[in-house]
A protein has these predicted regions:
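Short, small-residue-biased leader/transition segments that mark boundaries at the very start
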Residues: 1-7
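Cysteine-nucleophile protease catalytic domains, especially the papain-like/related folds used
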Residues: 8-40, 250, 254, 258-363
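Short, non-transmembrane alpha-helical segments in secretory-pathway proteins
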Residues: 13-75
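Noncatalytic regulatory segments and standalone regulatory/sensor domains
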Residues: 14-18, 34, 75, 79-194, ...
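Active-site-adjacent substructure of cysteine-protease-like catalytic cores
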Residues: 69-95, 352-414
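Acidic glycine-/aspartate-rich tracts in secreted/extracellular proteins
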Residues: 105-107, 397-398, 420-424
Length: 460
């Protein structure tokens, strides 16, 4: 090989490094999760991932998700990509977390990172399972687009390198020429210190990332619905289904819409002047005095959760949540045995309350570029699925490389989703709004995941 230096952009380098290799080893996948967890130590969602194990494996391609590789590859053409997806459980202090990782050596990715996920049932209840489906679809869409780039660039790149280095084209490979390549399109940007764990190097783009604006991590049960038992009003206490399948007569869940609104207010309304006063909730037989209170936002946000050591403003938070529960005309959804399984708010009632307290853009299909612009302006995003509402208030842009192919760096974008179930399933998820458009246009219903949002939310 001659001594000339080839100048290449990232996509060209990727096209010649693409190789039908076997899947990444377990150790590399664990290193990827560990590196991502270590990056979090500079953010609000501090994590320490240890003792990893793979709890579930599946194979995804554009035809769907399959338990066995043979089923997956039978469903598609030879040219199509099938990626092995691993769900990795890790211990994170006293709780169990979960990471979703692609083991495809050509397209390795950490698809979602959830510091606390206690069960599959909790994934369903919080809406995280739908969000994960959207994350997998986003990953799949990006691999399809990258493979298209590989297919179009590979031969022209091989020909150029062969000509520049004066070697036969059949001798050009990533391994043979990597020491002669300089990448020119790496953008100058502020990064954190790189985290190197085993064979994975990862870093955060600080000037592109926005750490979560909403600092609370509230839930729907005790202590958040604590004021429900203090006043006599129909529907606030009932037989409620428990996690283990039993039922208790207790306060009903606060509802994800009410928790989302209350948590957004801790950010949007904390510095509002004059401050907004809320009605002190009263019982059905009490005289309606019209007395109000102004929440002490500083006290309420002293700690992420209201049951953390040193938490403050608990009564204000409980009153605010009940006030929103009443204002949103929240109702109980019951199962076959007449036990409450969730608290629901109609879209009409939600928008009426949103209009009272917030300014925002009209409901629309999720658009990643517009959501990112809102976060840059320090405004919030409320995501809406058919039966869940959750806050996006941060975005994380990372760059990773595997030491065997250190020139092939990939950027990943993660949205910080606060699902309103205390710590459960709140975390970082890949979401690409182009994925849904692409799969719908190609009539691939399996990966279509329509998600609406209210964008650019701030105090009225």
């Amino acid at each position: 090989v001659g001594s000339e230096m080839c100048i290449r952009d990232r996509d060209e380098v990727f096209s010649i490094s693409y190789d039908e290799t076997k899947d990444l080893e377990e150790k590399t996948l664990f290193n990827m999760v560990s590196a991502f967890a270590n990056l979090q130590n500079g953010t609000t969602t501090r994590s320490n991932a240890t003792s990893f194990k793979i709890v579930k494996e599946s194979f995804i391609n554009k035809e769907g998700e399959f338990k066995k590789q043979e089923q997956a590859t039978r469903a598609i053409n030879n040219d199509d990509i099938t990626s092995k997806i691993c769900e990795i459980e890790f211990s994170n202090g006293s709780s169990i977390g979960r990471a979703i990782v692609s083991a495809n050596a050509n397209f390795p990715a950490l698809i979602a990172f959830i510091p606390k996920c206690s069960s599959e049932k909790m994934m369903e209840q919080t809406g995280a399972s739908k969000l994960l489906h959207a994350s997998k679809a986003s990953y799949l869409y990006n691999t399809i687009k990258m493979k298209e780039a590989v297919d179009s660039l590979r031969l022209p790149t091989l020909e150029k390198i062969s000509k520049e280095l004066e070697i036969p084209i059949n001798e050009v490979s990533y391994e043979a020429v990597k020491n002669y390549i300089t990448i020119t399109d790496a953008e100058p940007t502020t990064r954190s210190t790189a985290v190197q764990i085993g064979d994975i190097e990862m870093q955060i783009y600080h000037d592109k990332s926005i750490f979560p604006l909403v600092k609370t991590n509230w839930g729907q049960e005790d202590p958040y619905n604590g004021w429900f038992s203090n006043i006599d009003r129909d529907g606030l206490r009932d037989w409620v289904r428990t996690q283990d399948g039993g039922k208790n007569f207790t306060s009903v869940p606060a509802g994800c819409v009410n928790i989302a609104m209350a948590q957004m207010m801790t950010y949007t309304h904390c510095n509002k002047r004059p401050p907004v006063a809320f009605l002190i909730p009263t019982g059905k037989y009490e005289v309606q005095t019209g007395m109000t209170f102004i929440p002490n936002w500083d006290q309420m946000t002293k700690t992420p959760k209201l049951d953390d050591p040193g938490a403050g403003g608990i009564i204000d938070a409980q009153r605010l949540i009940l006030d929103l529960y009443i204002e949103n005309k929240t109702t109980s959804k019951k199962d076959w045995d007449n036990a409450v399984i969730s608290s629901e708010v109609s879209e009409q009632n939600m928008l009426k309350t949103m209009n009272k307290y917030f300014k925002y853009q009209a409901k629309a299909a999720f658009n990643g570029d517009m959501a990112w612009a809102a976060l840059r302006d320090k405004h919030l995003v409320l995501m809406l699925t058919s039966d869940h509402a959750f806050i996006i208030s941060g975005i994380l842009v990372t760059e990773k490389a595997i030491s065997t192919r250190e020139l092939v760096k990939r950027n990943d974008v993660y949205w910080h989703a606060n699902l309103g179930w205390a710590d459960e399933c709140t975390g970082f998820y890949q979401l690409d709004s182009n994925a849904n458009t692409y799969f719908q246009a190609n009539a691939v219903q399996e990966w279509a995941h329509k998600m609406d949002y209210l964008n650019n939310i701030y105090a009225k």
